Every structure is written in structure tokens, then in C-alpha cells.
């Protein structure tokens, strides 16, 4: 029914908070298999929900929600066992999947049919060579404003976050000896 009113944002966020709180209380602290969410992953997502609910788009902030987000995030940072990787670019290399920085890690199924591979990568990949033949729109590009947020000369973080034309990536298409992104979709 197109006349059905939308759910209120605050009601949806309250439901998400209840679901994630239940997950934090009932999931194991250590995942039972790769790609499975554990209590720490749920707690990290819960912190993000409280941060979102704190009023970032309304011009004012709900300090109670900000404090809750801070408390949850600090618990994850200090007690979950995750740690930052020394080299940011390594996060995107296949051999570093499910690394100590991964709070929640989706698993890639190479050359699977649509819906079973990493569909986010397939949606965003510059072309199908990067994904082994599966990609969709591939027209997403970083905006000039976004690229200008990186310091001049910072090619490591920028090139690891976005494929930039002319950049060689040794860890993409490894069987073919790497991949140079030409900007073509």
C-alpha cells in the first residue's frame, strides 16, 4: 500500500538497539567459524547505532547516546582482542583475510554465482577482471572532495582505499601477476 506511513526513524533504531543488545548478550565472545559475528562484533555495531542515534544530522547531540557509544566502543577497543594492523594496505590483501583488525569479516566466495560472492565488491569494482567475472554497476568513483582529504603524496592510504588510474596492485588478480587499474569500467 503506497499510502502506508513509513516507520519512524527512532522506532527503527530502538528495534535495532534491542536486537544488537540481545546479540551482545547471547553470541559467543569468539566466533564459531570464519565470517560469523561474535558478541564483540555485535557490540561494535551497537556503538555505531548509538552514535547514529545521537543526532548527527539534527544539529544537536544526545549526550546520553554519545556516552553509550563511547562506552561500548572503548570496551571493544580495550577488551575484544582486536588490534590495528601496522600497514593499512595489508588489510585489503587476500592473505590477510580475517586478521586481528577484523571485527566483522564477510567471506568471499570466488567465482560463485551472483548472490554468493562478495556482492559489495562486485557492486563497486572498477571492472569484472577484479572480481573474477562478476560485477554490476562499477561506475562508482571517489569524488574530488574525498580524494582531496588525503595528504599530498599519501599514495599508500589513498590507493589502498580507492583504485586510482595508473596504479599497479600486486595483490589483485594475483594469478595474472597483479592488476593495473586503467580507470575503465
Predicted regions: what is each one?
Residues 28, 184-185:
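Aromatic-rich, solvent-exposed beta-strand/loop patch
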Residues 2-14, 26:
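Aromatic/His-enriched, Gly/Pro-containing loop or helix-boundary segments
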Residues 13, 20-22, 36-183:
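An aromatic- and glycine-enriched ligand-binding surface/loop that stacks and positions planar moieties
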Residues 26-36:
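Flexible helix-coil transition and linker loops at the boundaries of alpha-helical arrays
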Amino acid at each position: 500500500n503506497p499510502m502506508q506511513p513509513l516507520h519512524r526513524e527512532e522506532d527503527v533504531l530502538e528495534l535495532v538497539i534491542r536486537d544488537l543488545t540481545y546479540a551482545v548478550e547471547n553470541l559467543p565472545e569468539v566466533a564459531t567459524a570464519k565470517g560469523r559475528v561474535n558478541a564483540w562484533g555485535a557490540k561494535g555495531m551497537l556503538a555505531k547505532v548509538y552514535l547514529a542515534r545521537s543526532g548527527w544530522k539534527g544539529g544537536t547531540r544526545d549526550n546520553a547516546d554519545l556516552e553509550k557509544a563511547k562506552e561500548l566502543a572503548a570496551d571493544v577497543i580495550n577488551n575484544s582482542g582486536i588490534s590495528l594492523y601496522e600497514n593499512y594496505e595489508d588489510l585489503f590483501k587476500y592473505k590477510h583475510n580475517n586478521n586481528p583488525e577484523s571485527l566483522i569479516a564477510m567471506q568471499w566466495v570466488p567465482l560463485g554465482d551472483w548472490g554468493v560472492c562478495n556482492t559489495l565488491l562486485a557492486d563497486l569494482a572498477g571492472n569484472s577482471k577484479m572480481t573474477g567475472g562478476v560485477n554490476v554497476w562499477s561506475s562508482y568513483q571517489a569524488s574530488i572532495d574525498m580524494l582531496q582529504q588525503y595528504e599530498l603524496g599519501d599514495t599508500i592510504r589513498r590507493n589502498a582505499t580507492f583504485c586510482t588510474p595508473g596504479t599497479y596492485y600486486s595483490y589483485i588478480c594475483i594469478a595474472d601477476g597483479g592488476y593495473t587499474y586503467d580507470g575503465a569500467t
